[in-house]
Structures are given as C-alpha cells and as structure tokens.
Amino acid sequence: MATTLSFSRHGAGIGDAAAVVRANAVSSGLDAAVATCPGWTVLDLVLHLGAAHRWAVAVLDGRPQEQWPTEASVRAEGLAAGDVLDWFDDGMVHLLQVLADAPADLQAFFFLKDAPRPREAWARRQCHETTIHAVDAMAARLGSAPTAAQTWIHPELAADGVDELLTGFVPRRTGRLRTVAEEPPLTVLVRATDVDRAWTLRISDQPVVTTAGTGEDGPTGGIPDALWEGTAVGLYLALWNRGDELAETGPRPFLERWRRDQRIEWS
C-alpha cells in the first residue's frame, strides 16, 4: 500500500481539509445535523476529528499505549474549551508540527499492514481522515453529500485515498466483505476514469485480496465479475459511502453489499 504522494503533500492535505471543516462548521453552526453521519451534529464531528488528531500525536510522540487518549477524554477536553473550533485548530497544528519534527525513520505503531514508514503512514492516514470528515462538514452545510465537483479534492489525492482504503483497510482480517455460504469467489475491478489507477479485489470467504496497478484491464487482467468506474474523486467519495458517483456493470453486482458491509474500524 505504498503511497504515490509525498509526505509534504499529505501534510498540506491535512491543513486544506481542516480549513474546510472550520469554514463549513462556522457556516452551518455546531448544532447542524451531518447528513453523511446520521445522528451526528457538527459539534460531534469536530470533537471526533480533534480526538483523531490528538490520538495520532500520542502515537507519534512514542507514548505507551496506556497513555493514549480516549475519544471520551478528548471529547470532554474539547467541550471544556472556550472555543471548540480554536481547540480543533490547535490540535491540527500540533499534529502538523509533530509530523514535521519526526525523523523519516521514526519507529512507531501503525495499524495497517504493508504500510509506508510510520511517519509517512500517519501523515497519509490523517490526511484522508481529515479530508473525508471535511466532506461531512460540507454535507452539514449543504444538507446532503456534496458531489465530486463541489469539493476541492484533487484527483491524485483522491486516488491515494482509494488506494489506502482498498489495499490497507479492506484486506484486514476484521473486514466484513465476504462471500456467503456456497457462493463462489468473485472479482471486482475498481477503475478511475481520469487517472491511470485501478485495483482488483478478490472476494471470497477469506480476507479480501487487493491488487493495485494501472491499465484499462486492471492489474490482473481478465473479465471481472463486477466493474466499478468513476472519476478518482467520485470513487473516493462513493467507496467511503459519501456519494454515489460510481457506475457498476458486470454479471455479479456487489456494490450494494459494499455499502452495507464495508465499515472502518481502527483497532
């Protein structure tokens, strides 16, 4: 799950997305419902993202696991702050400072296999964590998920986020994407239409096997059971269940099951 983006590009992505979170939180108000996160308000979103940033800082700082903050403790800290958006900004800036100060060969925990080195892996993870939740902040202001064209996201960053999801999160043993009893394995080809990136997912009763590559026929060739196509940003939003700008063709549709079963867990 090597990244094609630079460390500095991921850092810039964190800052860009955090600015989108703040601007939309100010516009919609902290009590506004988040259309893409049922049951959440913008305040919940800001507190969650602030907790994610602070948790990453604790890991990068090398604190023992028992000293990592819980979301509940950080939420209480944010609620006690004089201005929760200033508190959010402070956490984001601290994260960027810690990333910038970390040596390239930093040894630190990271929870996805075959990831880049920890410093790069955490910059990437926090970039996409912040970007996707910035889309949620936009959804709170708009009242529905934004289209790809309404976002600020660059296709290269979106393709990197798709890659992290499909090669990092989806193949985990805790993943829920499986065939059911007596159902034969199937392949899904995910192909971006505006950048030369493609991924083949082999789905069976075992953890998903993802192969990343390029080309119209995808990294493994052959005829897939399902083909998912869209722009890089459209795929990014759709695969994170923040949009529907993804076209599915093929004899064994699987997209509905993806939307039902694909959930992200950090542990």
Where are each of the predicted segments found?
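A glycine-rich beta-turn/hairpin centered on an aromatic-Pro dipeptide
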Residues: 163-201
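Actinobacteria-biased recognition of intrinsically disordered, low-complexity terminal regions
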Residues: 1-15, 19, 23-26, 217-219, ...
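Conserved catalytic-core motifs characterized by acidic clusters
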Residues: 67-71, 107-113, 209-210, 215
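Hydrophobic alpha-helical segments and helix pairs
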Residues: 86-134
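Active-site-proximal cofactor/substrate-binding loop regions of enzyme domains
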Residues: 5-76, 82-86, 90-91, 95
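C-terminal interaction segments
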Residues: 218-267
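Short, contiguous alpha-helical
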Residues: 27-67, 113-176, 235
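Acidic/His-leaning functional-site neighborhoods
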Residues: 190-232
